[in-house]
Design a protein with these regions (language model features):
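Histidine-centered, transition-metal-coordinating active-site segments
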Residues: 1-222
Length: 222
């Protein structure tokens, strides 16, 4: 699992510990997880963007992958826009998954893979889209980057989140007694910064917001 995390990006870190074989390809499972994450995130973001109104159907129809799915679903005569949206997303997920499976199986056959060692020594990632699907997915990702991730409301929320995290870190690092006792107990052996980072990393969005209010809003009970 750790090796898969280290090799999450196509270009592995050459400084990675030797036990993670930095010069070799990750396992098929790790390669597959990279694509599964991407498929899930892309389509979740399509749904979120349309639901929030930050992007419109008319805008995203400029993306070939979405347009093909939307045309097929719309031809069924469904009147409910919410149902149409959900079925379009499911259609895109299905198309990406099938394309990834077909291309990967072809790559495995071409590379004559019979063992994990064959995967590691293939010299390339064997879990991959064919060039046509890769281009379609890239077009979708470029659209989401330009129209959703850089939407002014998203940028504002991202900046707000950074301020909250900085405030929390400064508060805990400045006065460690504000940390729960079990986290305070780790400080002598691990250091205040490591402990604070771990504590904040384990927070949900809601918990972080509540903690920020408790620490900085004098009207909120601690």
């Amino acid at each position: 699992m750790r090796e898969g995390i280290i090799k999450h990006q196509p270009e592995s870190d050459p400084a990675a510990p030797p036990e993670y074989a930095p010069g070799e390809a990750p396992t098929l499972e790790a390669q597959l997880v990279d694509f599964v994450d991407e498929i899930a995130y892309n389509n979740h973001d399509i749904d979120d963007g349309l639901t929030s109104g930050m992007i419109t159907v008319e805008q995203i129809r400029a993306v070939a992958l979405f347009r093909a799915a939307h045309d097929e679903v719309s031809a069924r005569g469904i009147a409910d826009a919410r149902i149409v949206r959900h079925q379009v997303v499911r259609h895109i997920i299905d198309r990406c998954t099938r394309a990834l499976l077909a291309s990967t199986l072809a790559n495995l056959e071409e590379a004559r893979v019979e063992s994990v060692a064959d995967v590691r020594g293939a010299g390339r990632r064997l879990v991959a889209y064919d060039p046509e699907m890769a281009a379609l997915v890239r077009e979708l990702k470029d659209f989401l980057l330009k129209n959703l991730y850089r939407h002014f409301r998203v940028v504002r929320m991202g900046d707000k989140a950074q301020h909250i995290l900085r405030d929390l870190f400064a508060a805990y690092a400045g006065e460690p007694l504000q940390l729960p006792p079990r986290h305070q107990a780790r400080i002598p052996s691990e250091g205040i910064h490591r402990v604070v980072c771990d504590y904040i990393a384990g927070m949900t969005d809601r918990f972080a917001l509540d903690e920020h209010r408790k620490l900085f809003d004098p009207l909120v009970r601690v």
